[in-house]
Amino acid sequence: MKSLFLSAVLLQFFETCWSQFPRPCANSEGLRTKECCPVWSGDGSPCGALSGRGFCADVSVSDEPNGPQYPHSGIDDRERWPLAFFNRTCRCAGNYGGFNCGECRFGYWGSNCAEYRESVRRNIMSMSTTEQQKFISYLNLAKNTINPDYVITTGTRAEMGENGESPMFSDINTYDLFVWIHYYVSRDTFLGGPGNVWRDIDFAHESAAFLPWHRVYLLHWEQEIRKITGDFNFTIPYWDWRDAQSCEVCTDNLMGGRNALNPNLISPASVFSSWKVICTQQEEYNNQEALCNATAEGPLLRNPGNHDPNRVPRIPTTADVEFTISLPEYETGSMDRFANNSFRNVLEGFASPETGMAVQGQSTMHNALHVFMNGSMSSVQGSANDPIFLLHHAFIDSIFERWLRTHQPPRSIYPRTNAPIGHNDGYYMVPFLPLYRNGDYLLSNKALGYEYAYLLDPGQRFVQEFLTPYLQQAQQIWQWLLGAGILGALIATIVAAVIVFARRKRRRNQKRKRAPSFGERQPLLQSSSEEGSSSYQTTL
């Protein structure tokens, strides 16, 4: 735990941001100068320098040798990221973050980013119907909202001209932004000529960065949904699939049931049946030597359970998860899909959760769920098209967190050198800008401002799972409740006044009926005093 705490303290000195190609930098000027240091509107200076939020700094990349899996050099824009595009970016101070240091780093809030707040990711099966529907509506909003801050590149850096005279960037909706990012980080390398590609390359899978990269990726996704919805209490839920016999979330109330007429499609009763996928035609891109440009390519596909049973006999079990967590070594041997007794390789799904040994022809753990879904989620590059991807990877991240808490590893266990390209400790994560180093995120999720409901102690879990949602709803309608309370008090006061006045008048009439008649006379002072007293009380 000490080492995790130290990592959390050190993290504040590293620069942060939210995603790929900030809009202010995606132009000829940015490409020509190779500088991405946008102005912060709060003080009108690049990176908020006048307010001490950050400054524009040279990018220094690691020159540690990579593994033998990728023998090429200088032909892929992702090599030595982000130097093909930019060599100067914002470096944010303290708890500040964002591409111009105008936001806060993960877990911190407020105008000065001084407030630490821990958000809780919950089991989607434990959420109320209203909460589930809100989550689905947020995803659909993200699918239909152009992201205001980020764009994607539709061409390689070489295609844009030596001085960036032909920039190739495009708008994209917020959901598909993350589909495209997942495609871009895992795509093949173009070697020149139709179909001539290098396939044994992936900057986010099949080695050490798999877990840290996806952790940062989910945090970005979470943050962007908060921004477009204005709901800063939003968290990505998880699906605890241990021991499941089927796709429990594949219902029309959740992530979409099976279409009765075509089992490969989503039920028309689900909003996801209208979704179009992007970045799924890998071979076509390779043959054209072109990047995915986010053009719609057809409906979302899913046919859970109708996969090759020899490749995935079953959904992973509790025993599989516990064995995986018990493995003490994060990375071993060749540090790729052939590594034995590697926690990362077993959890990713290239090794057995019973023996720890690498297996061929089978997919386990993380990979097993992708294959089991038997559709858009089953190919690496386009897998994020299926919203179940979010639920699945949130649970994978929670298993990573359990391993960190169980073994409390020092930072030094993360491979510094000879991992496959993109996976060494000092390598910046592709394609995030400004920059995140892989090894900086081998640390507890508490340092990043979030927790998982099932990892809380029972008391905290009760508060988060049952009490907090109601308190959040009350907070959202407190102004209405206050107004209703004031109106109710006013009505009660008026009613009370009417009742007192009626009673006073009745008593006065009764006294007049009982009093003997001695002719006309002035009212008694006492009677006048009673009237004044009642009036006073009524007024009070």
Swiss-Prot record:
Binds 2 copper ions per subunit. It is found in: Melanosome membrane. It is a single-pass type I membrane protein. Its cofactor is Cu(2+). Cu cation B binds at residues 366, 370, 393. GO terms for cellular component: melanosome membrane. Residues 1-19 form the signal peptide. Residues 511-540 are annotated as: Disordered. One of its GO terms (molecular function) is tyrosinase activity. The chain crosses the membrane at residues 481-501. The keyword Signal applies. Disulfide bonds: none annotated. Coiled coil: none annotated. Its main location: membrane. Pfam families: Tyrosinase (PF00264). Residues 502-540 are cytoplasmic. It catalyses: 2 L-dopa + O2 = 2 L-dopaquinone + 2 H2O; L-tyrosine + O2 = L-dopaquinone + H2O. Residues 20-480 are lumenal, melanosome. Glycans are attached at residues 87, 233, 293, 340, 374. CDD domains: EGF_Lam. Residues 527-540 have a biased composition (Low complexity). Cu cation A binds at residues 182, 205, 214. Belongs to the tyrosinase family. This is a copper-containing oxidase that functions in the formation of pigments such as melanins and other polyphenolic compounds. This is Tyrosinase. It comes from Oryzias latipes. The gene is tyr.
